[in-house]
Amino acid sequence: MPTYRRPLNQQQRDILALLARFRFGTCTLFSQSLSTSLRYTHERLRILVEQEYIGKRYDNSYKLAGRSAEYYLLPKGIAMLAENDIASPKLVKLLAKDERASDRFVRHCLSILGAAAQLKSLYGKNLQFRTRSDYAGNTLFPQPLPDGYAFIESPGTEERTHYFIECFDGTMPESVMRATITKHIEFYDNDNWESDTRYPSIVLICRDERLKTKVEKWVQKAVAEGWSDNLHFELLIVTP
């Protein structure tokens, strides 16, 4: 007789939806993002792995490095999201590659999810966070697209405070990080921001205090060489 499996509950579906947007996650990051306990989050992940909705990256090297298990979508989970119009055909193709993703890509995805959780803890539950998969093809934003876009809408008004998020997590060379800072300054200086709203504040997520100090100097130098003093940069430390 086939084994009966209970349908997924909403909390398990929420984990799958997060993986569709952020690609990878850990038990701690899921717990923070969904405001659930580590114990219950771990149990939900165990069931999703057991039922082959998600895969798990973990071996002895993780334990030695004090690194948490990392989770990603498997074909069964991707298919369920596609059937419910949560994953577009283009996103489905990208998600199918995650089982073979590089360590560098995984770490960057975890940094973005960590940034989203940290920003919600700082700015409250009204903050909405979007990833590249949410705004793929958007020509209003600078290119390459920022790692994230977040906004807060004031209740009862159309006023919006918004942010571009860039994660400097040790997965890219210094030249790329500097170019990312310059990208925003040049985009703004060249009047490419075609919106009536103010250009979003740029939040640079740094992996540690040492990098944050470096980035602060790069920002000061790049702003001094640009045309406008109206851009606002904010630096935060987030460790996934």
Regions found by a protein language model. Name each.
Residues 102-109, 117-163, 171-179:
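Active-site metal-binding core of divalent-cation-utilizing nuclease and nuclease-like domains
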Residues 32-39, 137-141, 210:
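Acidic-and-aromatic substrate-binding clefts and catalytic sites of carbohydrate-active enzymes
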Residues 1-94, 98-99:
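Nuclease-adjacent, charged terminal/linker segments that flank catalytic cores
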